[in-house]
Every structure is written in structure tokens, then in C-alpha cells.
Amino acid sequence: MSKESYELKAEARERVGKGSSRELRRNGLIPAVIYGDKQAPISIALSTNEVTKRIHAGGFMTTVGTIDVDGKKIKVLPKDYQLDPVRDFTMHVDFLRVSGNTLVNVEIPVHFENEEKSDIKIGGVLNIVRHTVEFHCPANDIPEAITVDLSGLKIGDSVHISNVKLPKNITPVIADRDFTIATIVAPAAGVEEETTEEASEE
């Protein structure tokens, strides 16, 4: 399941805008917003170091955390963050306010196992079409990843979402077709064709 929860301390922001955001960043803080759950959005400031540490720890987008805003604790799920394209530090984060029964759409990573029990062991190449899959799931019960078992797959075989054993309470956002997650191809054809395959599915 998703990684252990975390808590970040924040302060409410009264001033917003580019000038305010630049001032925050000079002081080691980043602007962020908490929205959703039929409540007014809250603009906040967070420690750049603490947020960056959480992002690099992994599982940031699939882990419910707590933000302490001037003493008020709010359960949140990160929905988006922006990185500086040059210096790779966090510039802004959007958080969704959640409760125990909140349903969310989350991109969940795909992990593969038992490659040695498939034709990959004789030279087949795993062509991954989807590295993540978007699911509907409860905010407090988000899987860390979904696992695809490659046992017995031959060159030319494909893995579709219907072949994957999914945890309880999660359903794919794409529900109108049995989309492909990966294929095993012959070595000569082992160039990833994600863009082509995805385009043909959309």
C-alpha cells in the first residue's frame, strides 16, 4: 500500500502573486494551495527543503499527508507540483483536501515481476506501453504500485489491464476498453513504441 504518511508545517499566506512567490523562495519557502472538499482554497507557504525531501523520498503523489497550517491539521493528497526547469527545485505544489471517504484519481506506477519466467529469458524485450495507470481509489487506501506478473508470457504476447490482479476498491479511469500495458517483442523489434501505441489507443 501507499507509503507511511507525513506531516508538513505551513503558514497561511495573505499575499499571493509572482512578487510574493519570489519573496517566499528567497526565504527558503515555496507557495502552495490546498483546495477541494467543497471548501475555500487556502494559500500557504511550505519549507522548500522539507517538500523537496518528500518528493525525492518517492511515493509523494500517492501518499496522504497532513499539513499543519498555523496549528490546524488538514489531510491532503498532492495533485501537482512544478519544478524549476533549470535548477530542479520545487516551485509550487497543489494539494487536494481529503477525508476518509474521498475518492480520487491517481496515477499509480506499474511494476513488473517474474521476467525470468517469460520469453524475456530467451531474448524477448519487454516493451512498456504504460509506466503508470490512472485509477479511481479511496484517498486513504492508495496502492504504492500495481504489479504485473509476466510468468508464462511468450514473444508476441500482450498484457492488458484485464490480466492484472488489482487491489480492492480501485478501478481504472479508462473503463471503455481493455487497454495494453506492455508487450513482449522479438529482439529485432525491441524499440519502445509507446507514442505509437498510445496514439492508436486514444
From Swiss-Prot:
Keywords on record: Ribonucleoprotein, Ribosomal protein, RNA-binding, rRNA-binding
GO cellular component: cytosolic large ribosomal subunit
InterPro entries, per the entry: Rbsml_bL25/Gln-tRNA_synth_N (IPR020056), Ribosomal_bL25/Gln-tRNA_synth (IPR011035), Ribosomal_bL25_b-dom (IPR020057), Ribosomal_bL25_C (IPR037121), Ribosomal_bL25_long (IPR001021), Ribosomal_L25_dom (IPR029751), Ribosomal_uL5_bac-type (IPR020930)
GO BP of this protein: translation
Cited NCBIfam families: bL25_bact_ctc, PRK05618.1-2, PRK05943.1
PANTHER family named in the record: RIBOSOMAL PROTEIN L25/GLN-TRNA SYNTHETASE, ANTI-CODON-BINDING DOMAIN-CONTAINING PROTEIN, RIBOSOMAL PROTEIN L25_GLN-TRNA SYNTHETASE, ANTI-CODON-BINDING DOMAIN-CONTAINING PROTEIN
Protein name per Swiss-Prot or TrEMBL: Large ribosomal subunit protein bL25
Organism: Agrobacterium fabrum (strain C58 / ATCC 33970) (Agrobacterium tumefaciens (strain C58))
